[in-house]
Amino acid sequence: MSTLAEVYTIIEDAEQECRKGDFTNAKAKYQEAIEVLGPQNENLSQNKLSSDVTQAIDLLKQDITAKIQELELLIEKQSSEENNIGMVNNNMLIGSVILNNKSPINGISNARNWDNPAYQDTLSPINDPLLMSILNRLQFNLNNDIQLKTEGGKNSKNSEMKINLRLEQFKKELVLYEQKKFKEYGMKIDEITKENKKLANEIGRLRERWDSLVESAKQRRDKQKN
């Protein structure tokens, strides 16, 4: 049956997309398979098929529909993960800029660059409470240190030393923050990988079930002919 062969090909394409982690394309392929199996297809018109084959096709549709629903959940989860990873990459860029800036801080203007609108696009969006806490604490301490330096000019060296210590502490906190985030995202990626493997196993089960149903239908038809 050429139409079912086409469906098999589409399902195989969907499996490949799943293995690559492209759940959006996999979903589109399964939806295409549903359309091919739709009632508008003359080659699969129920009045031309035996009840066993018709039942097998209905079961196949149900299984494919279930896979589409699972993929929708995975797509939603994947989209959420990508947004979060994008946020972390943005935050890591901020940290890299600060870590790579080894020039001494002299004057209030340098410490208050974060208030400059030109830097807002770089810093936003920062929605992570932990990172916000680290950045706000650093900014608060730097502003205080620089103010003390300005008011007591004789102790400028001590003030600069304090500022450098603040930056060293910030580097350590940022490293711990990034390690924590990478661990969290690693766990989430493992979870998605397990879901992907589960989906691939269910696809294999679906194929075996379909083959069994078709074989059973053939045997019944042969018995009726004999």
Curated annotation (Swiss-Prot):
Signal peptide: none annotated. Residues 52-85, 182-209 form a coiled coil. GO terms for biological process: autophagy; macroautophagy; phosphatidylinositol phosphate biosynthetic process. GO terms for cellular component: cytoplasm; phagophore assembly site; phagophore assembly site membrane; phosphatidylinositol 3-kinase complex, class III, type I; vacuolar membrane. The modification N-acetylserine is found at S2. Keywords: Acetylation, Autophagy, Coiled coil, Cytoplasm, Membrane. It is a peripheral membrane protein. The N-terminal region (residues 2-83) bridges the coiled-coil I regions of ATG14 and VPS30 in the base of complex I. The C-terminal region (residues 123-226) is involved in interactions with the PI3-kinase complex I, localization to the PAS and homodimerization. Belongs to the ATG38 family. Autophagy-related protein required for cytoplasm to vacuole transport (Cvt) and autophagy as a part of the autophagy-specific VPS34 PI3-kinase complex I. This complex is essential to recruit the ATG8-phosphatidylinositol conjugate and the ATG12-ATG5 conjugate to the pre-autophagosomal structure. ATG38 is required for the integrity of the active PI3-kinase complex I by maintaining an association between VPS15-VPS34 and ATG14-VPS30 subcomplexes. This is PtdIns3K complex I subunit atg38. The gene is ATG38.
